[in-house]
Amino acid sequence: MNKNDLRVIKTKKGIHEALLRLLNKKPLTQIKVTELCKEATINRGTFYFHYEEVGDVFSEFFEEIIQDLKASYDEPYKVLGKDNFSVHRLDPNMVRIFHHIKKYEGFYKIVFSNNVSSNYYYMLFDEIRANLTSDENNHHQIITNNFFYSYQANAIIGMIIEWYRNGFQESAEEMNVYLMEIVKFKV
């Protein structure tokens, strides 16, 4: 079966959604294949046709989210071009990170809840930091780059956490404006 087959896409989406529901109740390590199959309303044969274990489902779903996050981060560069990029030329409408968060809100609610391991947080931190590190336009003359990238990644995550604590009440567009105001703020 082709991975672009609509049946495969729908089945995997259902499994991903079932995994999210279960992750709201317990850690990944405690979720069994049988339990996931029941939640996704599929049989074990269908599960094993696509995956070997529950961790594979999480890895695939996390990779999908990270690819979308990377695409969201890169969006302003597509509009302005890597050579012409400047924070001062950046319009809040070009920022897509918060649209990404809204799209995967269920996942981020789990990542930032107090009920789960901080491993998810650090996985997300590492991915955001990797995006910042690979950005040729993102460097600081005085501060060691590792500290600079970690500061920026935590600043973005801090905004996302605050948004989460507010129940994602603000729109992605509002969050974009807040981010741009913070980025352009000079002490």
Question: What is each model feature region?
Answer:
Residues 135-182:
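Hydrophobic/aromatic-rich alpha-helical bundle segments in the mid-to-C-terminal region
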Residues 20-28, 104-105, 135-137, 186:
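Basic, amphipathic alpha-helical hairpins
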Residues 114-139, 143-150:
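Amphipathic alpha-helical packing segments from all-alpha helical-bundle domains
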Residues 25-55:
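Helix-turn-helix
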Residues 1-26:
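Basic, helix-initiating cap at the start of DNA-binding domains
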Residues 74-103:
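Hydrophobic alpha-helical connector segments
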Residues 95-123, 161:
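Amphipathic alpha-helical segments used for helix-helix packing
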